[in-house]
Amino acid sequence: VRDAYIAKPHNCVYECARNEYCNDLCTKDGAKSGYCQWVGKYGNGCWCIELPDNVPIRIPGNCH
């Protein structure tokens, strides 16, 4: 498990405005919790706590 930005296909973050949206998204994929990281490295994106290793995360490089 790891703490990371959860990724959509093509290495894009899930953009957000509310913590509840990210918490629901992250826990649905098996994370302990999640919140909306405002003005982070990739803008406003969902950050997950203890996200399982099999779930894609945002990695360095372009969002396609």
UniProtKB/Swiss-Prot annotation:
<dbReference type="GO" id="GO:0090729">
    <property type="term" value="F:toxin activity"/>
</dbReference>
<keyword id="KW-0964">Secreted</keyword>
<keyword id="KW-0528">Neurotoxin</keyword>
<protein>
    <recommendedName>
        <fullName>Neurotoxin BmK-II</fullName>
    </recommendedName>
</protein>
<keyword id="KW-0738">Voltage-gated sodium channel impairing toxin</keyword>
<keyword id="KW-1015">Disulfide bond</keyword>
<dbReference type="InterPro" id="IPR003614">
    <property type="entry name" value="Scorpion_toxin-like"/>
</dbReference>
<keyword id="KW-0800">Toxin</keyword>
<feature type="disulfide bond">
    <location>
        <begin position="22"/>
        <end position="46"/>
    </location>
</feature>
<dbReference type="GO" id="GO:0006952">
    <property type="term" value="P:defense response"/>
</dbReference>
<dbReference type="GO" id="GO:0019871">
    <property type="term" value="F:sodium channel inhibitor activity"/>
</dbReference>
<feature type="disulfide bond">
    <location>
        <begin position="16"/>
        <end position="36"/>
    </location>
</feature>
<keyword id="KW-0872">Ion channel impairing toxin</keyword>
<dbReference type="InterPro" id="IPR044062">
    <property type="entry name" value="LCN-type_CS_alpha_beta_dom"/>
</dbReference>
<dbReference type="GO" id="GO:0005576">
    <property type="term" value="C:extracellular region"/>
</dbReference>
<feature type="domain" description="LCN-type CS-alpha/beta">
    <location>
        <begin position="2"/>
        <end position="64"/>
    </location>
</feature>
<comment type="function">
    <text>Binds to sodium channels (Nav) and inhibits the inactivation of the activated channels, thereby blocking neuronal transmission. This toxin is active against mammals and insects. BmK-II is 6-fold less toxic than BmK-I.</text>
</comment>
<comment type="similarity">
    <text>Belongs to the long (4 C-C) scorpion toxin superfamily. Sodium channel inhibitor family. Alpha subfamily.</text>
</comment>
<dbReference type="Pfam" id="PF00537">
    <property type="entry name" value="Toxin_3"/>
</dbReference>
<dbReference type="InterPro" id="IPR036574">
    <property type="entry name" value="Scorpion_toxin-like_sf"/>
</dbReference>
<dbReference type="InterPro" id="IPR002061">
    <property type="entry name" value="Scorpion_toxinL/defensin"/>
</dbReference>
<feature type="disulfide bond">
    <location>
        <begin position="26"/>
        <end position="48"/>
    </location>
</feature>
<feature type="disulfide bond">
    <location>
        <begin position="12"/>
        <end position="63"/>
    </location>
</feature>
<dbReference type="InterPro" id="IPR018218">
    <property type="entry name" value="Scorpion_toxinL"/>
</dbReference>
